[in-house]
Amino acid sequence: MRQFIISENTMQKTSFRNHQVKRFSSQRSTRRKPENQPTRVILFNKPYDVLPQFTDEAGRKTLKEFIPVQGVYAAGRLDRDSEGLLVLTNNGALQARLTQPGKRTGKIYYVQVEGIPTQDALEALRNGVTLNDGPTLPAGAELVEEPAWLWPRNPPIRERKSIPTSWLKITLYEGRNRQVRRMTAHVGFPTLRLIRYAMGDYSLDNLANGEWRDATD
């Protein structure tokens, strides 16, 4: 098992803020752990340009190149162009708890955006914005310093020298397709880099980019 621990500039502890939400999903996880098979939980720090699946007919990079564990599947998605925490398990109930909006499981993202968001923009993210698939739930949103634990991205982001960039810490309690990117674009600050740091009780917690660890209890 490949593991790597960062010895300096360690990551901060996970922290969530509770938000009152009213919209719930009736979606159910269809994967069920075979009887008598023990639960497995794998945490992976997904690099940029890696698909959150084990096979790809087009020959793109997949989880198979990094994780030699069979029978586990990602709880939710993390887009190919996003980085950070991916929780994989063979337990359907755990997958549902981590991904269904009705469970109100927080997911923390560190997001580099173009420009410096105003307080009005932050308040809009916190209160919810209306996207083409409907209004978003209330979210946590705050302007933060660049994370001390940040790893270099390969390739680097494309940024315009004439426009500054900044970092946001965003906490979501739902999981729509490319939601963070659409939310920041909606308030006028496009996402340049997106890193998921935590899902519920699971976090990167010093796990290096491209590495995995077994988090089975």
Curated annotation (Swiss-Prot):
Keywords: Isomerase, rRNA processing
GO molecular-function terms, A-Z: 23S rRNA pseudouridine(2457) synthase activity; RNA binding
Keyword check for rRNA processing: yes
Keyword presence, Calcium: no
CDD domains (UniProt xref): PseudoU_synth_RluE
Listed Pfam families: PseudoU_synth_2
One GO BP: rRNA processing
Domain of life: Bacteria
SUPFAM superfamilies linked: Pseudouridine synthase
Catalytic activity entry: uridine(2457) in 23S rRNA = pseudouridine(2457) in 23S rRNA
UniProt-annotated catalytic positions: 79
EC assignment: 5.4.99.20
Function: Responsible for synthesis of pseudouridine from uracil-2457 in 23S ribosomal RNA.
Family under the similarity heading: Belongs to the pseudouridine synthase RsuA family.
PANTHER family listed in its UniProt record: PSEUDOURIDINE SYNTHASE FAMILY PROTEIN-RELATED, RNA-BINDING S4 DOMAIN-CONTAINING PROTEIN
Protein name per the record: Ribosomal large subunit pseudouridine synthase E
Native source species: Escherichia coli O6:H1 (strain CFT073 / ATCC 700928 / UPEC)
